[in-house]
């Protein structure tokens, strides 16, 4: 507990106090890394407004947190808070996090500015019982801190752990090898590393499918092809903290031919969204997602994968999936109206109602369940289905109650009957600021946090609200879209306060939640 408390507090103080080029510490990054993230501590500290009064209050509280867990350490902690360079680590250079191929190890990399000061810091931690005694071998100094290995030399600092729980000391030779390696033998000499640098994000994350164990890749690719190379299926996410919003962009860097062909065939089965479903729900709807598909092409694309094809062919419910998919052509949307109770409705533009015959064909089979399942007509092209225990069909245990059918040219599927006939009184989603951005996108999703808080406050008393809602109450909405022109995924998390950087607002929130 003392170790965890120290590193949580220390990480926060380092980030908050960071305000010189030098040794080539990036050469330590393993060449076979399957994921690499970089954090611009200097830029984030400036955006957090730590030079103002709120920032100073946050720093003092975090320093107090450290002091409470480490006795007789007040002087050193005060020196580090006053001057981060006293830690011996650079808080002006980027911090790196990495994960090796197949997740055999994960680590943090920082630049060392003063090896002696870093040694003093670790000696103090050793006296506090936080880490073991320092040892020197293979050209580096190292120690063990719980399940983590710390190793460093005059250029670089490594904190390494094995997600599977391997003994920390067993990783010393790998860490020493990375600390000794030349730049040409590291991840820093790859095109993917350059992509991270070119992105210039406050936080940038590069990852490939090689991050996953072999046993996890097959289900994700659904048995698509043995020719797929996981290390060539990769993406880069860039996050920036801006005034009033957090912005994240994700783009594919995939070069694997198998996956590129899969993606191309998927895009051939989809098209830009028309936005026809925006008028179906009020402006304060909690959550909504949409895309536009050619159902017949999508079904063909799905069936090109052997695992998915088997799933359709051996479904526990004998439906004509080809007929259902082929009826869909146009916008498809999924709406969550009440997040606390999970109320939802799926809508899809259809060109025919003929596919409902496959539902009628189920009636003899359902009649043989002795009332365990019931399928009832509720008007023209309208059905109600009830099942006493969903686990019979590998669904969640307990009663399952849904309504589905076709109405006004749209197929619907919902767990709340009143959503079928719901009318919009007043402004619809189309009248919102974000509603004007939907048309033409490949995918568009929105989460309305103002609506969420209205639902929560009308359902729960203030004393019943989890602490997380204190933060959520400061949010406006989150939108996620895939643009037609570059197929890049763009996400924005908007705060209610549009006049301050979101990191500065987070600093104020820390003061609020930790205040006495």
Residue map of PLM features:
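Sec-dependent bacterial lipoprotein signal peptides
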Residues: 1-17
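Structural boundary/hinge residues at secondary-structure and domain interfaces
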Residues: 19-131, 136-144, 186-343, 357-372, ...
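An internal, short helix-loop-strand segment that often contains or flanks glycine-aspartate motifs
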Residues: 55-61, 65-93, 125-243, 314-318, ...
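Helix N-cap motif at beta-to-alpha junctions
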Residues: 112-116, 163-166, 351-354, 416-419
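Flexible loop/turn segments at secondary-structure boundaries
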Residues: 296-298, 354-355, 419-422
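Exposed, low-structure sequence patches enriched in small/polar residues
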Residues: 347, 360-363, 450, 487-497
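C-terminal "exit" segments of structured domains
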Residues: 492-493, 501-506, 514-516
